């Protein structure tokens, strides 16, 4: 159909179309648009999430949980009268030890308790304690009037031993450890497989290895692997430095070892890492003065706990040392330390991997030849390669650059590997391992 409108009229019609008012969306249209892309159960899931948030809010209000500078509940939730009544009704208890249970199978058993530095008493249980909760040798809380047993207490453990437990997992993973692929596989066979797949050992009828010795020159990644194991496993991780068990008074070191394994037995699964074990695990000798007798007693207690009369339970033990030649043969035998893993100097592939691991968190140029840098660092440990990367960053900072170049790495190799070679103890320690 021919268009009889002129250009001006056609332009006027187009302007009317453009000037036509735009209708805004109402609430129904917006709600409909929001439903696009949602699943069938989105509304029900959203309703359940809202209900959970409301319940959490009510629980926090009832329990008085609220962030404040003092850490106290709001004053509106204080109940001073009830607190005073609780203080008057609950008297402080005295710590005693149950030494013997008389007529344990009868309906009215009696308990002999020993109050330290005071006396022994034959007492009954209070109404709050069941007879099955009390065992011989257990610490209990008794009142000061009738000396009735009101509460069972956990075993006494030295605070220094409790502080050895690692609460927060380290941030080191197996991908952060370079040049130790074979060692990590052997370590995971001993630590992770028995915890995650114990049925494999039951089907074969063997007991998994319970002790591992990590030995090698300084800086080869022994402690780093232990930190990666602590990050990987959900078991309780206890870290002990060998020098912490060397105490001034007679019997203190052996007592700490006993309490350490007592605490470990209370856990579902536990991993104990002894770093620098040569501080207490040296071979026994008589120097005539008796200076090392206490250290030897501590080592004998450790030997007994590793494979003595009492079963060790689900406790794995890792030990690390730079001098395996100084350790006592009784500590090294199978049954106590079943597997010995050597951490030798990394090869070319391992050194390249270590360079890439440390450069991963640095601002570096692209196309840096890490294999060339690894070839320029023969017989170097992982710690020395890390020092090379740090020095390369220092050269970049000195030149007021934001990125480290390959030239910085080459200068760092000359400084750390070549200039500091006279300070390196790796050749000497290689003769010990």
Swiss-Prot record:
PROSITE patterns: AAA. InterPro entries: 26S_Proteasome_ATPase (IPR050221), AAA+_ATPase (IPR003593), AAA_lid_3 (IPR041569), ATPase_AAA_core (IPR003959), ATPase_AAA_CS (IPR003960), NA-bd_OB-fold (IPR012340), P-loop_NTPase (IPR027417), PRS7-like_OB (IPR048723). ATP binds at residues 216-223. GO terms for biological process: proteasome-mediated ubiquitin-dependent protein catabolic process; ubiquitin-dependent protein catabolic process. Keywords: ATP-binding, Cytoplasm, Nucleotide-binding, Nucleus, Phosphoprotein, Proteasome. It comes from the Eukaryota. GO terms for cellular component: cytoplasm; nucleus; proteasome accessory complex; proteasome complex; proteasome regulatory particle, base subcomplex. Phosphorylated. Dephosphorylated by ublcp1 which impairs psmc2 ATPase activity and disrupts 26S proteasome assembly. The keyword Cytoplasm applies. Disulfide bonds: none annotated. Residues 1-23 are annotated as: Disordered. It holds the Pfam family PRS7_OB. It is found in: Cytoplasm; Nucleus. Residues 8-23 have a biased composition (Basic and acidic residues). GO terms for molecular function: ATP binding; ATP hydrolysis activity; proteasome-activating activity. The 26S proteasome is involved in the ATP-dependent degradation of ubiquitinated proteins. The regulatory (or ATPase) complex confers ATP dependency and substrate specificity to the 26S complex. Belongs to the AAA ATPase family. This is 26S proteasome regulatory subunit 7. The lineage of its organism: Eukaryota, Metazoa, Chordata, Craniata, Vertebrata. The gene is psmc2.
